[in-house]
Regions:
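Feature responds to low-complexity, polar/acidic, surface-exposed segments characteristic
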Residues: 1-2, 6-65, 73-135, 149-175
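Flexible glycine-rich surface loops and low-complexity tracts that mediate binding to linear polymers
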Residues: 145-146
C-alpha cells in the first residue's frame, strides 16, 4: 500500500496518530471505494476529481461523482440498476477483479463473466495466492492492483505499469 501511495496510485483513508497513512487494509471496501481505488490505480485520480458528473446513478456521494463518472464513461463499471450504483454496498473480490480486467482491456461477456473472473485473472497474473475470493478486504485490492501493474494489456506486450509510465503517471525510475 505504501509503495502504491508513493506512486500516487493509492491514498488511504486518513492519517494515524503517528502521522503515517491509514490504509484501513483489514476492512472490505464499498463499491464506491473500490472504483475510487481502481481509478487512482490507473493514474487518473486527478482527472477524475475534475470530471463533472456524467453517470446516471442517484446514490453516489458527491465526493465520488468524478471517480464513478470516469469509470462509467470508460466502461470500467456499471450500476446495480439503471439509476443505482450500489455505492455503499460491499465490493466483492469478483467485482474488483472484474474492474481491473476491464481496465486491462478485457470485456465481460466476451473474455470472462463479471461474476466469475477468476480463471482469466489467474491467467493474466493479477490474482495473487494471498487474495481471499470470499472475504475481500482493502489489502486484497492492493494485492490485485500491485499484480496488475505487471500484467500485460489485452492484445499488447505493454504492461499496465508501462502504460502508466508512457502517460506520465510516474517515471520508470520511480517505479
Amino acid at each position: 500500500a505504501a509503495q502504491l501511495k508513493e506512486l500516487d496510485l493509492f491514498l488511504g483513508v486518513g492519517v494515524l496518530e503517528d502521522g503515517s497513512t491509514d490504509f484501513d487494509l483489514d476492512r472490505a471496501p464499498s463499491r464506491v471505494e473500490a472504483v475510487t481505488m481502481l481509478v487512482r490505480s490507473l493514474g487518473k485520480g486527478v482527472q477524475a476529481e475534475l470530471q463533472p458528473k456524467t453517470h446516471p446513478f442517484t446514490d453516489v456521494p458527491a465526493w465520488a461523482d468524478g471517480y464513478v463518472s470516469y469509470a462509467y464513461d470508460q466502461g470500467l463499471t456499471k450500476g446495480t440498476a439503471d439509476t443505482a450504483f450500489g455505492a455503499e454496498d460491499t465490493a466483492t473480490g469478483a467485482m474488483y477483479v472484474t474492474f481491473m480486467l476491464r481496465a486491462l482491456g478485457y470485456a465481460d461477456g466476451a473474455d470472462f463473466t463479471w461474476d466469475s473472473p477468476w480463471s482469466l485473472a489467474e491467467d493474466c497474473g493479477i490474482l495473487p495466492e494471498i487474495v481471499d475470493r470470499n472475504n475481500f478486504p482493502r489489502a486484497d485490492a492492493v494485492a490485485v492492483t500491485c499484480a496488475a501493474l505487471f500484467a500485460e494489456q489485452k492484445d499488447s506486450n505493454d504492461t499496465l505499469a508501462q502504460k502508466l509510465v508512457d502517460r506520465g503517471a510516474f517515471s520508470q525510475a520511480e517505479f
